[in-house]
Amino acid sequence: MDNKYKGTKTELNLQAAFAGESQARNKYTYFASKAKKEGFEQIAALFLKTADNEKEHAKMWFKELNGIGNTAENLSAAADGENYEWTDMYEEFAKTAEEEGFTELAVKFRAVGAIEKHHEERYRALLKNLETSQVFEKSTVKVWECRNCGHIVVGTKAPDVCPVCNHPQSYFEISEENY
């Protein structure tokens, strides 16, 4: 993922634009939720519409920075980002919070850091599956479920096409029953 703006002020501007639009999108979704809870459906809908616009603005700047690669590159970048968050960022935030007497916040920072570690592990496992061609084929029998229609297939490989709804193999995942 080559970035033609590397080392320029324009790169910093693009990064700031991406960060600003991303934060605005999240804030507007939170504001929409609050407006909805307070009984203001139209206002909630406008916040969500604007949030969708901000998402597209952020995507535009992120693409300009060549931040979106192929799935393997994206999984690797995501894992690296999660690693930074749990090994450096949240631990430093927790230490600072403790030094400043905010012990409850330090506990929250560390708890979120533990979640980020899980995110990293999940992305790395998915990347390994992708690199070893084990996304839709396993060495042991699994229960595969079509994400579109719910059709169940038992075997080592998801079908190329769902025999019920004709959606492609990409719609199959290993079925989890955690209830």
What are these regions (language model features)?
Residues M1-Y179:
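Non-heme di-metal
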